[in-house]
């Protein structure tokens, strides 16, 4: 615990094209080795492709894709009397957003060969429809929490 109280969360400036912090966070997740301009090109092109496929506003596509992949509950390990229990806990909003973005990016990276723009667009479209890697991860997490609901009273 820091003596000066809890640290204030960093504020990420909105991206210049859409004026959205969500897009800026996605760009930062895509970025590898500090190559931000390359990450921006990938994200903007992916959003353009996804919005054309769905005939929807790019920000609306991204927002719905993230909403469909945000976990509501997850399990945390807790050791009680020599046994380790998986205890379901609610996911804070910031962590839920971080997990959703991470799963979308990882799902795009795991999609075989091809350009990252197209893979990210495909993952965004799948997440928008509630399918794909990110949605599958969310369902796994929810299933795990549901299976361990009996230990919810052990929450700390």
UniProtKB/Swiss-Prot annotation:
Its job: One of the primary rRNA binding proteins, it binds directly to 16S rRNA where it nucleates assembly of the head domain of the 30S subunit. Is located at the subunit interface close to the decoding center, probably blocks exit of the E-site tRNA.
Homology family: Belongs to the universal ribosomal protein uS7 family.
Subunit structure, interactors included: Part of the 30S ribosomal subunit. Contacts proteins S9 and S11.
Gene3D superfamilies, alphabetized: Ribosomal protein S7 domain
UniProt GO molecular function: rRNA binding; structural constituent of ribosome; tRNA binding
Protein name in UniProt: Small ribosomal subunit protein uS7
Biological-process GO terms, alphabetical: translation
């Amino acid at each position: 615990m820091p003596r000066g109280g809890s640290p204030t969360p960093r504020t990420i400036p909105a991206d210049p094209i859409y004026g959205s912090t969500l897009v800026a966070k996605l760009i930062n997740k895509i970025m590898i080795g500090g190559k931000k301009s390359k990450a921006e090109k990938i994200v903007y092109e992916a959003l353009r492709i996804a919005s054309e496929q769905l005939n929807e506003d790019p920000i609306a596509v991204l927002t719905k894709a993230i909403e469909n992949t945000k976990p509501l509950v997850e399990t945390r390990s807790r050791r009680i009397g020599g046994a380790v229990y998986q205890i379901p806990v609610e996911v804070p909003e910031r962590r839920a957003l971080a997990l959703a973005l991470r799963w979308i990016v990882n799902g795009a990276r795991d999609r075989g060969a091809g350009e990252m723009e197209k893979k990210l667009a495909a993952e965004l479209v799948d997440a928008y429809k509630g399918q794909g890697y990110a949605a599958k991860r969310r369902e796994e997490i929810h299933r795990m929490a549901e299976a361990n609901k009996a230990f919810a009273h052990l929450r700390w």
